[in-house]
Amino acid sequence: MAYNLKEVMANKPSRLTAGHRMCAGCGAPPIARMVLRALKPEDKAVISNATGCMEVSTFLYPYTAWTDSYIHTAFECAAATASGAEAAYKSLKKQGKLPENQEVKFITFGGDGGTYDIGLQSLSGAMERGHDMVYVCYDNGAYMNTGIQRSSATPRFADTTTSPAGSVIPGKMQSRKDLTEIMVSHHIPYVGQTIAVNNFKDLYEKSEKAIYTKGPAFLNVLSPCPRGWGYPTDMLMQINKLAVETCYWPLYELSLIHISEPTR
């Protein structure tokens, strides 16, 4: 069905407010803002955020840019934190301590360092257990917050502070990990790969599907970094456009078709 995204956005509150400290030209703020705008206005959210660029720039106690409940958690356990909160919510609802008609969604944000590497075990566990939550990876291809060190999301031959391109090596020598396909292999209900800007409808629609699909969902979102990638801050949209058009970052999604249990 055709719709006007600007009109939809105008009628929904921004759940990541202005005043955060993210860099100009960074892909992470529009990712968080658009993902959360996919929520229905009446629904509440619990945000779990791994340590990283987004966390240190949006939540500096006692200040916060988040309007929903927010949990800052360690690099390695953002998915585990969200899965625990989701399990507690279900238990409280079952006990009648929370209203049945109040929907709470559990959304986790983590960078590629906290998702591809340090937090992969807890992410895999949360997805396999079937928690009703969405994990959003904002993938900028390195540990940008701590000084642009390589991660397993860093492309081959990329220049980072721990894989410097020069006369000894031409940059990172290993190929990047395909985390989206790893999540597909978990056979979870929904997996999507999208971009920060340039195609807002794609990000919005995939976010909406992920949030309102029952069970675990995963979104891998390309999030260019002007400091780490070395582009002028006004080129964010062009960088995203090139990533898609060159098929470096193809846009796709997979929805698991529900198959009924066999009967005897």
Residue ranges and their predicted role:
Residues 2-135, 148-158:
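Cofactor-binding active-site loop characterized by glycine-rich and histidine/acidic residues
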Residues 255-263:
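Residue-level detector of conserved catalytic or cofactor/ligand-binding positions
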Residues 7-10, 99-102, 151-209:
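Conserved thiamine diphosphate
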Residues 198, 202, 211-212, 218-237, ...:
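Glycine-rich, Lys/Arg-enriched anion-binding loops that position phosphate/diphosphate groups
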Residues 137, 192-194, 218-222:
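Short, conserved beta-strand edge motifs with alternating hydrophobic and charged residues
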Residues 55, 140-145, 226-228:
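Short gly/pro/ser/thr-enriched loop/turn and capping motifs at secondary-structure boundaries
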Residues 37, 125, 182, 209-210:
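Hydrophobic/aromatic ligand-binding patch that stacks against planar heteroaromatic rings
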